[in-house]
Swiss-Prot record:
<dbReference type="InterPro" id="IPR035439">
    <property type="entry name" value="UPF0145_dom_sf"/>
</dbReference>
<dbReference type="Pfam" id="PF01906">
    <property type="entry name" value="YbjQ_1"/>
</dbReference>
<dbReference type="InterPro" id="IPR002765">
    <property type="entry name" value="UPF0145_YbjQ-like"/>
</dbReference>
<comment type="similarity">
    <text>Belongs to the UPF0145 family. Highly divergent.</text>
</comment>
<protein>
    <recommendedName>
        <fullName>UPF0145 protein MJ1170</fullName>
    </recommendedName>
</protein>
Amino acid sequence: MILMITSTTDNLEGFKIVKYLGVVIGYGDDPDDALEDLIDVAEDMGANAVIGIRISNELTTEIISDENYAVPELTYYAYGTAVIVEKID
């Protein structure tokens, strides 16, 4: 497992961004699950950091046709930019 640096800012003090790998998105039933999923996706891309992280949520309704009622579901999304950074000496 890579030590993943995560930040809501677009810069990391003491580090320089050497490569931008792209947008990453994770989702889950709570903010922590969404962030964990985001980190897994970034690791698979070869990133060692994710910058500009934002978390949002969406309320949807699942219709249960057999029982004729709706169940609300809240899904959290985490998104940011996967990057490779190097420590500045």
